[in-house]
Each structure stands twice: as structure tokens, then as C-alpha cells.
Design a protein with these regions (language model features):
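Cytosolic, long alpha-helical scaffolding segments
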Residues: 1-129
Length: 129
């Protein structure tokens, strides 16, 4: 998870540090949309951990699937933009890297959540025996 965040931050920092052009307006809007949805998802994940209540993990899984579909649609949209309009290769690279690492971040977080749920179930079962 930390590595995913590092890659996103480092790529964005290098883009700005090298004085590359800003992202296109639609790219910024798309990333804000993803960031908002991701923030809501992480709030749910945080609450699960806070309460140690993994009963709603199926709902969280559906939300995760929705987030992954959203980022994949945005990747497809960017590919279409590259085919039909003139785009800066550096902007496209940054945009792709942010979305792809976001997918990895979502997957890494969910793996951790699932492992924690399994551990809690094992612990409960072990106490009953």
C-alpha cells in the first residue's frame, strides 16, 4: 500500500519538477472523481477496522469492483483520446500511471482487509475450541 502511494506521489512530483504541462481539464476532473470515490471507500474500510466488524465486506467488495471498473473505463477513455486527439505523451504517462497504481492500491488494500477478516474468523474459531 505504501509502495503504491509512493509511486503515485513520486510520478506526480517528477512530472511537476520537470516542468511538464499540466494535465488536461478532463483528466483532472476524472482524477478528482476517482479520488472522491476512493476517499469514500477508504472511509468504509477505516470504519471496518475501527469496529473490527467485517460483516459488510461483501458490500465493500462491490464498491471495490465499482472503483476498479471506473478506473478501467477512464483508462479506456484515455486510450481513445490518444487515438483521436493530440495529447502530450508525458501527460498520458502520468495519467496512466496514477490510474494503474490506484488499481493496485485498491487491490492491495482489499487483500489486507480480506486477510484481516480471515484472521479474525480464525481467532474466533480458535477461542471457541
Amino acid at each position: 500500500i505504501i509502495e503504491n502511494l509512493y509511486v503515485i506521489a513520486n510520478n506526480a512530483y517528477n512530472h511537476v519538477d520537470n516542468n511538464h504541462k499540466t494535465l488536461k481539464e478532463y483528466q483532472g476532473e476524472d482524477l478528482i472523481l476517482v479520488a472522491d470515490a476512493l476517499g469514500n471507500w477508504y472511509a468504509e474500510v477505516y470504519n471496518m477496522y475501527k469496529r473490527l466488524d467485517f460483516g459488510k465486506i461483501d458490500n465493500n467488495m462491490k464498491e471495490r469492483d465499482h472503483l476498479l471498473k471506473t478506473t478501467n473505463k477512464l483508462l479506456d477513455k484515455q486510450i481513445e483520446h490518444i487515438r483521436t486527439t493530440e495529447n502530450s505523451p508525458k501527460n498520458s504517462k502520468l495519467y496512466f500511471s496514477i490510474l494503474l497504481e490506484t488499481n493496485e492500491l485498491i487491490s492491495s488494500t482489499f487483500k489486507l482487509l480480506r486477510l484481516h477478516k480471515e484472521f479474525e474468523e480464525f481467532k474466533t474459531q480458535y477461542k471457541s475450541n
